Amino acid sequence: MADGRPATLDDFCRRFDISFFDLRLTCIFCSHTVDLADLALFYLKKLSLVFRGNCYYACCSECLRLSALFEQENYFQCSIKAVHLEEIAQKKIKEICIRCICCLRLLDIVEKLDLLYSDETCYLIRGLWRGYCRNCIRKQ
């Protein structure tokens, strides 16, 4: 909330005194109402709301998946083996922000360590590190 506007769903609910279960937000991409299940996933993925034209927007899961694919195809910078990530980023693995390349979920420490010890690849896309989360790696 650096500019006074809520950035997360919980900030939004607190600021406007609304229950999460009563939220009605539109998807920034497809303009459909984001259903409760997708809002819950949006929250769990630690994504930020978009404020545009005096309205707040979230993103549905399908558009998130398509957005991740679009960014992968258009903003790919490089890929490295996860074992080299700490050296390249000059940070410990627990301090590196890594999102899932497919669903954009923020990876937890177990998933990051799994990337490291399984000799998986990490991808730099739009200046942000990406790898596979535990759900999407199984679908690969």
From Swiss-Prot:
Q: Which GO terms describe its molecular function?
A: DNA binding; zinc ion binding
Compartment(s) where it occurs, according to its Swiss-Prot or TrEMBL record: Host cytoplasm; Host nucleus
Q: Which Pfam families match?
A: E6
Residue ranges annotated as zinc fingers (unnamed) are: 27-63, 100-136
Q: Per its UniProt record, what Gene3D superfamilies does this chain match?
A: E6 early regulatory protein (3.30.240.40)
Keywords annotated in UniProt: Activator, DNA-binding, Early protein, Host cytoplasm, Host nucleus, Host-virus interaction, Inhibition of host innate immune response by virus, Metal-binding, Modulation of host cell apoptosis by virus, Transcription, Transcription regulation, Viral immunoevasion, Zinc, Zinc-finger
Which GO terms of the cellular component aspect does the record hold?
Answer: host cell cytoplasm; host cell nucleus
Q: Name one GO biological process term.
A: symbiont-mediated suppression of host type I interferon-mediated signaling pathway
Subunit annotation: Forms homodimers. Interacts with ubiquitin-protein ligase UBE3A/E6-AP; this interaction stimulates UBE3A ubiquitin activity. Interacts with host BAK1.
Family, similarity comment: Belongs to the papillomaviridae E6 protein family.
What biological function has been recorded for the protein in this entry? Plays a major role in the induction and maintenance of cellular transformation. E6 associates with host UBE3A/E6-AP ubiquitin-protein ligase and modulates its activity. Protects host keratinocytes from apoptosis by mediating the degradation of host BAK1. May also inhibit host immune response.
The protein here is known as Protein E6
